[in-house]
């Protein structure tokens, strides 16, 4: 387990046994059937548990429903035809009227129309898939697939990368992660993140072996000069690499100052590594620690707000060659922090919008490589 700070650990998760069994049961498959996947021959149960992501459905699978719920001649639910066996061989063009017996038993929402509307609306498809797995959809549409058909549609299990939260020099032979466990209920069933649930339920609780690998970084690294100051922004589990950075900086004994920005919803419940951080502060290893608790007051406060509050000092650090690091959510947080840096350059650097953008995005990030990001 040789690694450096800034690297990530790849974790190869497995599907929850109860979801695998539900899928087998609803399709009427034989769990012990020998099948062949991209990883060789094994039982169907093992294939579903280890080779394919069955905890969440994908767009390709929903699109396949069109062939399952639509009859050969026109858009009629397979369910309806099965209820009216006398007309199961009836065929017609879309413009032809339906037989009376089919009209009577038609549900309020035609499954084929629902599939078509989902396939035509990207946002609707995303919303639909966000809260459903294959079991949900199979129950909703009452469709059957062979294992081989399902393998062609289901996505393969992909490893998840987690920023390493420890220094190898401080913890030889060990690697530590900071993981937010995702669990929730929807449509009457318990759900969660594939890898986070797997680690929470299996590691330390069973003899389960976990597949892992190192994912080295080439760019998200500490300055070669140990006396260089650094600013770290890592809200939530984004603090992970900066715990490693701090352990390494303490181990190396350089004179560079360390400033950590951290935040989450509440100080009472999400103050990760509180004792460790307080120890760094007491020992003088952490020069400054700035927090942003978004729900501990009426007004929501995030790390980008704290950055702008300390804009003058941050700009002074930049002028003195400090490195700036950010880790965490790329959709909102990273963009807001990026904008805050541009505004700091405008307000405290006396730059125009164009010059400030060039300084942050070109000079610091690309030329000097002292604005570094690990976002996801």
Write out the residue ranges for each language-model feature.
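FNR-like FAD-binding dehydrogenase module
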Residues: 1-376
